[in-house]
Amino acid sequence: WYYLHLFAAEQPDFNWSNADVHEHFRTFLRFWVERGIEGFRVDVAHGLVKAEGLPDDELGPDRWNIAGSPDEDTAHEKLPDVGPAFNQPGVHDIYREWRRVLDEVGQDILLVAEAWVPTEADAAQYVRADEMSQAFNFPFLGAGWDADALRRVIDVSLSEYGAVGAPATWVLSNHDVVRHASRLAYPADMDTDPGIGPKDPQPDAELGLARARAATLFMLGLPGSAYLYQGEELGLPEHTTMEDEARQDPLWERTNHLIPGRDGCRVPLPWTRDGASYGYNATGRTWLPQPEGWGEYSPQAQEGCDDSTLTLYRRSIALRRKLGLGRGSVEWLDSEPGVLLLRNGTTAIVLNTTEQPVTIEGVGRTLITSWRRSETDESDAANTVEAAGAVVVPPNGACWLDDSAGGTDGGDPR
């Protein structure tokens, strides 16, 4: 005999055709809510129910990468959009059942779906009023450093989630992908999905951090909910030079050491500049090795520094709340190619993905910027709002501008 497991052999899948499984999870939900839990993140939320009869998947779990976009003419275009193990219609019955259980306790309990489904429309099905609360927006994460792709995802997400009465969400990193402080340093055609190892091309750390700070500031300017992955507030990069013998991701073992896997984004956080584990624990031993110099990213190293990534996160989150951006809306303004410019309430949000500075005309004061003073000359106009009512946004930069007068204009690149 055997049991079905979509992932590691140590993780057998539950049989959701068994009534006892449903009762087990109803009890589980009540147990934790009674102890004060306010929400649940559901891992692989699209993978609970399997197609009847458990048919084989001709392409396997990576069918979307192999088959291409549903809009493309591929050799596999006649296959279903999803494999028999994922995104089956019956999965929604389970979440309706869970929602009923949680509604019975009389509290607003959050259910968040980690669902790697093909489109935003598919993801929106999980957050209908009688199902889950929110779903991670992985198309936004996958849009990369591409202004057109980002705008498309934003528009489609706001439309699809809005159609079911749910807030849009935004995310740039998680435990399954290369950290965006490293991922965004690569060219668009660089596939980082399998992870990055010491034999792969190494990212430009300075470029990656500049883009990561800009992408985060832009994301926090959008309406909806923004999700942060532990360590990104420190500007942590991927550990790309981890020794092979230290890797623990099952993907590494199951692929005969061909795929580096996800260990690089799961390295324990640094808390102090120095120490055997940079303050992570008292023993100095960690399950994954921390790279040399990890302490320079620690909160201890960044506290009190106006230019630090930690300070940027704290200030932008506080300002986002003060300005009510999470409950706002998106109005796109004219801008040059490669530049995203939108109005959210009385705030203009700018992202420059190009390699040239861009001038934004008709602005009020600058509220916050992603770039550090060390990245521009002290006399550079990018550091200040020009007297003529314009601001220069440097390459790979983002900022928020006071647009209460409604005069912001994309202007010309320079």
Where are the regions a protein language model picked out?
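Active-site and adjacent substrate-binding regions of carbohydrate-active enzymes
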Residues: W1-V363, L367, W371-R414
